[in-house]
């Protein structure tokens, strides 16, 4: 195990380490039901994709250009919303992500805000696409 990974494990909660190291949600979801993108002041960028079935969020995937903290926040958001109704998912806040991770550094709280902001954009996109179903035929990016 390299020194950087050992340092992360020593400085962070088990939840943080788990969420920061996951890669199973990385990637572009083909024909997403919702898409959101945010670029943070720090330069981190997240593109977030939603798959919704029966008004429940079935899957969240994302692409990130950013730090380990942003990856941890994105995986946490996905964990918190997958399986929930779209309406209920609007209740997820950056504070929920911050609290779940337990050891997200306070000076990286903006990572949770960035991820949740992209998620809200994806929810808005999903709602707009449902109203204008012809839009789903076009690539979102």
Kindly give the residue locations of the regions a language model identified:
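Alpha-helical support elements that line or immediately flank enzyme active sites
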Residues: 69-84
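A short catalytic or substrate-binding loop motif that flags glycine-/basic-rich loops and adjacent residues
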Residues: 29, 39-43
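Short, thiol/selenol-centered motifs that function as redox-active sites or metal-ligating centers
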Residues: 64-73, 111
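C-terminal binding/interaction regions
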Residues: 1-30, 35, 53, 58, ...
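Short, flexible micro-motifs
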Residues: 30, 46, 69-70, 86
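Short small-residue beta-strand/loop micro-motif enriched in glycine and branched aliphatics
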Residues: 56-61, 71
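Short beta-strand elements
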Residues: 44-54
